[in-house]
């Protein structure tokens, strides 16, 4: 495979040994495919499957009125184009959504009064507007009210049946109490559970317990049927010596008989009591001709009857089925002369316990009617039951598809667990299902089978955005259904149309509520491209229908063997959410049932094949799967005779021939963020967790720099996140500037398609986290690019690779205590050269409303404000773009009418004569908050439709229209140039049969075309029909494109001039964007990729920094004590390898300088061959020269996780770069010039600046807001609060005996209201005396004591 456009500019040398046979799936596919399946927007209405939105409509409609005289049915739905595009929605605080039109059919029937027969009277069809449905952007996000949001996928327990026990915790004896639970997708939960007395109970929706047999009665079984379902019968025949029973060898294997076994034929004892009968002995008895055993009357006592016992003479039932055999019953039997007796085959010794029989005995009900009434009383306590209501309620519980839905997943799971064969579309429960569940539960109690592991990923599934939305929309439609039914009954059904019946508000409200306030609809983490990707791949066990933090135990949060290749064992938050919020592994995908699948490569007879299968956790348990690092020969065969494999969750050695699958890649175990950590295998898991989490907090820097030591994942993340722009088609770069790239396509050309692709770049946009989104082109005019090549870098990307931080020279050594406890000492060079400088954009907005006292006004005329404060405002009262603003500066001037006391008639007259007073308004301007500074970079003014625009709004609008016009003209020029070039190529050399006036017929030449105006080329007729068809297609495409451009321009201008939709009462809104350049400073947090984090303690002059023998000063000094106890040795290996990369880069830089001197690339090529050791290199000299220049700062390498560089590789590269293989160097003290006594580890490391900036945290207050009750200052920067002086601080002052300082702290500096006012007055007077009074909190205490009935009075003196 050839090198890509960016790949040949900077080749990353990989240390990976294991070839990857499967391409990694698109990282945000989970989101996009799920929502596409829900909307089915591109699928024609007739071809839509019964899933997603189609399924929701089908499940709710048709809706019948109560009299069944009319039916409203759903036909199809379609989406109209969205009103605003994504960018416009973000600017106007709107939701990016498409109007949903649903075709409804209303059928009205004629009902014959006498016969009740119905005939169709009228059918009306109509499109009904059903609200707006939010659309997903190309990046897998939603724009809701102007902000980008992500719907996080939810992990929940799969529908189906689960068996478990209480682990001996319920009963004091420690006895296991088994339970079964049938969980539907929608509907009532059904639980079965054993109690300590071995009676089986059932619960509906976790309500009061009932005997399980009550449910069986309600299902229509009687007592004998229940017993015959759960137990076999043993027939005893009367004989002279006692009773004979057939000998069944299977029943006696491994059993200790309680009594002697006697042969019925001979009377011999064949097995004594208490001695275990082996399987072999049991078989031998049968082989020796043992057919029946002889038992005495005592043996029958304690047995249970299988049938009702009837006295044949009187017809009286003297013993019922299930009754325990007693001496009286036995006597009665003998008296009636019974020759044959059926007993239930219940014998705990043979593994059949009397649980169902005991439940029957404990059940007070003995008929279906009684059971139904009992269930009704539990479900609807307080309501009087009737047989009809009880029956209807019971049917609705499990057997009505509208109220109960197992879902296809639930049915599949149930069939597998219970070994049933019900069809997938059987979504309700059946009698057979309930009986099978009870049989399995009883089997578990008898010691047969295993309980389920609820944390196994075969029992947990993922609900992605499409499914979550489907559930929410169903709720909205069900609310709407009730309203439709009521309206159908209350209107004249003959005259109404479908839209009169449908009120779409409940459906629209459900959608709005879901996207706006659901726990799973989250404000997107947009700090950098990695944080976006990770957020979209997140799996949460929280949210509606999920777990809660408080209830989740250790088991749910723990790593499970089935997580392998599906959920990352490393990336999860620290704190209360640990283990509840996870991330999908790199290669994982979600199947149609919602189970996570991981890819494996098929192995046949020890040989690897190219077949790749995706397996879910359930399927995987059946196979033996080798790890990706298993030794494989060059011919693709497993090398070792025995291979380490995972089989059903355990790791064992398996013979080579028995291996069925092998992992596709070592990194399929971990998530995207963890796969970006080089030498992950050398880091402790806790630190790797911090490393993967902190990469998501890295701030995009002004100059991005890809890591020298990477893992090969960087380009994949940059591409899939959408931060970098990739070419859609192969072509040549026609035009490039900062805001757009134009590519002339050279492949995939079609006369009906445009020949040029135009890519617009985002410039200095604000992200959700106030970081800066800026894209810049990396191509030049004339460059040839292929489809998929990166043509523009985005935030935190460098030549199409993720670049979260910078590569800096670090030394591990203590430095005068400035790197104590993870502090970081940095060189002044880092600040001077803007190495870690970032741009942050803050948005401030203000709205002018129409109040009861009059409209607010945005103006420059503000009362009691000097001209100095207004220096940055224009005539309209809005700050100018480019103004430097600091805390307290006015951004937008605004005045609000004051409320005043009623005026006397005289005052009204004076007011009418002399006009308004200035004092009638108060200043409510938008000011910069405390601690904030920056430069105004953009101002947007929004006016309500119909409100007059001020000069600033008009000038912004004029500029915007000019920009749109220029855009349209530029695009039209590009389009025309391309179209006429293609038209010219098409006409040249062909034979013209007609043309414009003066055009010579015959062969078309270039000169003839040059002499003819281009607009006349269309009139040239050719004798070649195929060519003419192409000309016509080209003309149609040109006309269509021109019309589309004009239409888009007019549409955008119309939107600009029309005015904006505003919230109620808002007349005008102004948004001001302020950019601030944040340099690195003490207090900022930095981190590496291995969980090594610290805070900058000091910025040291370059001359004081430790330096190398060649005079180069190190950039950063880190504490060596941060490594051994944290066990993240990966950072040391990265440092060494980074040092080697930089050394090799310098060597290549020297070779490049030689090329610049003598013009020959021979030296450069040989150096590159030495570094890349046979890897593919560019062919042309210009490409080689550019590669040499790009690599002069360091050779980038990839060390994939679990398959990266080993220690010998690192030493080899250090030697190759000309360094000591120990990786240590002699450093000199910058302050004295003396060498340090011992060698120091120096190297290059990729460090990140995290989004915990001291500027956002530091805060100071003199006076500010106070709490209403206690009158103490509020806390926190957001509330402009004070510094808390707590209990322990009070102890400190007490210990020092600083009585006056303490008194001041507790009174005038806190909540002594009168005292603090006096202090303020004293300061104004220039005085420094004050007197402390009573703190307000003491008054609160007194009031609280009085409220408790304790009167507290203060006495003076």
UniProtKB/Swiss-Prot annotation:
CDD domains with a match to the protein in the record: RNA_pol_B_RPB2
**PROSITE patterns (UniProt xref):** RNA_POL_BETA
SUPFAM superfamilies, per the entry: beta and beta-prime subunits of DNA dependent RNA-polymerase
Q: Which reaction does it catalyse?
A: RNA(n) + a ribonucleoside 5'-triphosphate = RNA(n+1) + diphosphate
Q: Which InterPro entries match?
A: DNA-dir_RNA_pol_bsu_ext_1_sf (IPR042107), DNA-dir_RNA_pol_bsu_external_1 (IPR019462), DNA-dir_RNA_pol_su2 (IPR015712), DNA-dir_RNAP_su2_dom (IPR007120), DNA-dir_RNAP_su2_hyb_sf (IPR037033), RNA_pol_bsu_bac (IPR010243), RNA_pol_bsu_CS (IPR007121), RNA_pol_bsu_protrusion (IPR007644)
A single MF term (Gene Ontology): DNA binding
- The answer, when asked if Plastid is one of the entry's keywords, is no
Q: Name one GO cellular component term.
A: DNA-directed RNA polymerase complex
Query: Which Enzyme Commission number(s) are listed?
Result: 2.7.7.6
Record keywords, A-Z: DNA-directed RNA polymerase, Nucleotidyltransferase, Transcription, Transferase
Listed under GO biological process in this entry are: DNA-templated transcription
The record ties this protein, via Pfam families, to: RNA_pol_Rpb2_1 (PF04563), RNA_pol_Rpb2_2 (PF04561), RNA_pol_Rpb2_3 (PF04565), RNA_pol_Rpb2_45 (PF10385), RNA_pol_Rpb2_6 (PF00562), RNA_pol_Rpb2_7 (PF04560)
Annotated PANTHER family: DNA-DIRECTED RNA POLYMERASE I SUBUNIT 2
Family statement: Belongs to the RNA polymerase beta chain family.
Note the subunit structure.
The RNAP catalytic core consists of 2 alpha, 1 beta, 1 beta' and 1 omega subunit. When a sigma factor is associated with the core the holoenzyme is formed, which can initiate transcription.
Role description = DNA-dependent RNA polymerase catalyzes the transcription of DNA into RNA using the four ribonucleoside triphosphates as substrates.
**Protein name, entry field:** DNA-directed RNA polymerase subunit beta
Species in which this protein is naturally found? Maricaulis maris (strain MCS10) (Caulobacter maris)
């Amino acid at each position: 495979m050839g090198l890509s456009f960016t790949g040949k500019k900077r080749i990353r040398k990989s240390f990976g040994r294991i070839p990857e046979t499967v391409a990694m799936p698109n990282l945000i596919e989970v989101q996009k495919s799920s929502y596409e399946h829900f909307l089915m927007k591109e699928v024609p209405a007739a071809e839509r499957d019964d899933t997603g939105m189609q399924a929701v409509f089908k499940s709710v409609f048709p809706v019948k009125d109560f009299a069944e005289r009319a039916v409203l049915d759903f036909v199809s739905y379609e989406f109209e184009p969205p009103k605003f595009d994504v960018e416009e929605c973000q600017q106007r605080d709107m939701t990016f959504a498409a109007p949903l039109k649903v075709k409804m059919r209303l059928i009205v029937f004629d009902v014959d009064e006498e016969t009740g027969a119905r005939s169709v009277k009228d059918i009306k069809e109509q499109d009904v507007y059903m609200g707006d449905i939010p659309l997903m952007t190309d990046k897998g996000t939603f724009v809701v009210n102007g902000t980008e949001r992500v719907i996080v996928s939810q992990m929940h327990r799969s529908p189906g049946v689960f068996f478990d026990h209480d682990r001996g915790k319920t009963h004091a004896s420690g006895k296991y109490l088994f339970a079964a639970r049938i969980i539907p997708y929608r509907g009532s939960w059904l639980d079965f559970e054993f109690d300590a007395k071995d009676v089986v109970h059932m619960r509906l929706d976790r309500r009061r317990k009932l005997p399980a047999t009550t449910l069986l009665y309600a299902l229509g079984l009687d007592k004998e049927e229940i017993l015959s379902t759960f137990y076999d019968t043993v027939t005893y025949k009367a004989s002279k010596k006692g009773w004979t029973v057939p000998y069944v060898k299977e029943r006696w294997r491994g059993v200790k008989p309680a009594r002697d076994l006697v042969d019925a034929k001979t009377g011999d004892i064949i097995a004594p009591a208490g001695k275990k009968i082996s399987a072999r002995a049991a078989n031998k008895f049968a082989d020796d001709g043992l057919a029946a055993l002889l038992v005495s009357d005592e043996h029958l006592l304690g047995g249970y009857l299988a049938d009702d016992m009837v006295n044949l003479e009187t017809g009286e039932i003297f013993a019922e089925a299930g009754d325990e055999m007693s001496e009286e019953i036995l006597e009665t039997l003998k008296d009636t002369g019974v020759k044959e007796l059926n007993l239930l085959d219940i014998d705990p010794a043979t593994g059949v316990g009397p649980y169902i029989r005991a439940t029957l005995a404990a059940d007070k009900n003995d008929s279906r009617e009684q059971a139904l009434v009992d269930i009704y009383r539990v479900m609807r306590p307080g309501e009087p039951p009737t047989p009809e209501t009880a029956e209807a309620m019971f049917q609705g519980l499990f057997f009505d598809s509208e109220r109960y839905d197992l879902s296809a997943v639930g049915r599949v799971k149930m069939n597998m667990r219970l070994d049933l064969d019900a069809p997938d579309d059987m979504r309700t429960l059946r009698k057979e299902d309930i009986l099978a569940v009870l049989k399995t539960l009883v089997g578990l109690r008898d010691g047969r089978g295993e309980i389920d592991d609820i944390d196994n990923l075969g029992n947990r599934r993922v609900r992605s955005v499409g499914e979550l939305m489907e559930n929410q929309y169903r709720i909205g439609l069900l609310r709407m259904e009730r309203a439709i039914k009521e309206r159908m009954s209350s209107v004249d059904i003959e005259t109404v149309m479908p839209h009169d019946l449908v009120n779409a508000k409940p459906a629209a409200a459900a959608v709005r509520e879901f996207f706006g306030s659901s726990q799973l609809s989250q404000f997107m983490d947009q700090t950098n491209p990695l944080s976006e990707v990770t957020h979209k791949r997140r799996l949460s066990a929280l949210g509606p229908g999920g777990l809660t933090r408080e209830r989740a135990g250790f088991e749910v949060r723990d790593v499970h063997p089935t997580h392998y290749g599906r959920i990352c064992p490393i990336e999860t938050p620290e704190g209360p959410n640990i283990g509840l919020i996870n991330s999908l592994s790199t290669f994982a995908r979600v199947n149609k049932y919602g189970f996570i699948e991981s890819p494996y490569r098929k192995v046949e007879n020890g040989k690897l094949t190219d077949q790749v299968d995706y397996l879910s956790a359930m399927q995987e348990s059946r196979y033996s799967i080798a790890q990706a690092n298993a030794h494989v020969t060059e011919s693709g065969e497993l090398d070792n005779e025995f291979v380490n494999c995972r089989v059903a969750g355990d790791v064992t050695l398996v013979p080579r021939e028995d291996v069925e699958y092998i992992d596709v890649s070592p990194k399929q175990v971990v998530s995207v963020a963890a796969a970006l950590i080089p030498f992950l295998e050398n880091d402790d898991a806790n630190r790797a967790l911090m490393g993967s989490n902190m990469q998501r907090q890295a701030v995009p820097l002004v100059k991005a720099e890809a890591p020298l030591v990477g893992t090969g994942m960087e380009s994949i993340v940059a591409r899939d996140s959408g931060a970098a722009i990739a070419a859609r088609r192969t072509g040549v770069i026609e035009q490039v500037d900062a805001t757009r790239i134009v590519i002339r396509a050279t492949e995939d050309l079609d006369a009906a398609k445009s020949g040029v692709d135009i890519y617009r770049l985002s410039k200095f946009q604000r992200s959700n986290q106030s970081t800066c989104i800026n894209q810049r082109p990396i191509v030049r005019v004339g460059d040839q690019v292929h489809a998929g090549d990166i043509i523009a870098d985005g935030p935190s990307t460098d030549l199409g690779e993720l670049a979260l931080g910078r590569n800096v020279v670090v030394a591990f050594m203590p430095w005068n205590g400035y790197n104590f406890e993870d502090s970081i000492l940095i060189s002044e060079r880092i600040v001077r050269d803007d190495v870690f400088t970032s741009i942050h954009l803050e948005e401030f907005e203000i709205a002018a409303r129409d109040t009861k006292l009059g409209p607010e006004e945005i103006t420059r005329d503000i009362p009691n404000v000097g001209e100095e404060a207004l220096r940055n405002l224009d005539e309209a009262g809005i700050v100018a773009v480019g103004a430097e603003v600091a805390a307290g500066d006015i951004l937008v001037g605004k005045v609000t009418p004051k409320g005043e006391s009623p005026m006397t008639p005289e005052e009204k007259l004076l007011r009418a004569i002399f006009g308004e007073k200035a004092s009638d308004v108060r200043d409510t301007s938008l000011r910069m908050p405390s601690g904030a500074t920056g430069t105004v970079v953009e101002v947007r003014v929004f006016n309500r439709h119909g409100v007059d625009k001020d000069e600033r709004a008009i000038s912004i609008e004029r500029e915007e229209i000019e920009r749109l016009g220029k855009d349209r003209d530029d695009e039209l020029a590009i389009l025309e140039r391309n179209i006429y070039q293609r038209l010219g190529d098409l006409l040249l050399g062909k034979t013209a049969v007609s043309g414009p006036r003066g055009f010579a017929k015959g062969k078309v030449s270039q000169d003839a075309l040059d002499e003819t105006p281009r607009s006349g080329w269309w009139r040239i007729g050719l004798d070649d029909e195929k060519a003419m068809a192409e000309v016509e297609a080209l003309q149609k495409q040109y006309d269509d494109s021109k019309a589309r451009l004009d239409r888009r321009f007019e549409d955008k201008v119309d939107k600009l001039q029309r005015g904006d939709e505003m919230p109620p009462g808002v007349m005008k809104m102004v948004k001001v964007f302020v950019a601030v350049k944040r340099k690195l400073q003490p207090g900022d947090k930095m981190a590496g990729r291995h969980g090594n984090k610290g805070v900058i303690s000091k910025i040291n002059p370059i001359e004081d920094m430790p330096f190398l023998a060649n005079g180069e000063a190190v950039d950063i000094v880190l504490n060596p004590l941060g490594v051994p106890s944290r066990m993240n040795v990966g950072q040391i290996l990265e440092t060494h390898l980074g040092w080697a990369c930089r050394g090799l880069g310098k060597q290549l830089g020297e070779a490049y300088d030689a090329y610049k001197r003598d013009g020959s690339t021979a030296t450069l090529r040989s150096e590159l061959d030495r570094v890349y050791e046979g890897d593919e290199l560019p062919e042309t000299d210009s490409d080689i020269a550019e590669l040499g220049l790009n690599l002069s700062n360091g050779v980038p390498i990839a060390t994939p996780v679990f398959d990266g560089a080993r220690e010998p590789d690192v030493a080899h590269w250090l030697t190759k770069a000309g360094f000591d293989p120990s990786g240590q160097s002699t450093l000199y003290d910058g302050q004295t010039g003396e060498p340090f006594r011992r060698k120091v580890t120096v190297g290059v490391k990729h460090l990140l600046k995290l989004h915990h900036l001291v500027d956002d945290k530091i805060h100071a207050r003199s006076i500010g807001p106070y709490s209403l009750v206690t009158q103490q200052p509020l806390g926190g920067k957001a509330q402009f609060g004070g510094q808390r002086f707590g209990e322990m601080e009070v102890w400190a002052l007490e210990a020092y005996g600083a009585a006056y300082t303490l008194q001041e702290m507790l009174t005038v500096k806190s909540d002594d209201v009168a005292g603090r006012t006096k202090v303020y007055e004293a300061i104004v007077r220039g005085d420094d005396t004050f007197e402390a009074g009573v703190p307000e909190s003491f008054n609160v205490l007194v009031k609280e004591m009085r409220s408790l009935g304790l009167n507290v009075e203060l006495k003076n003196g």
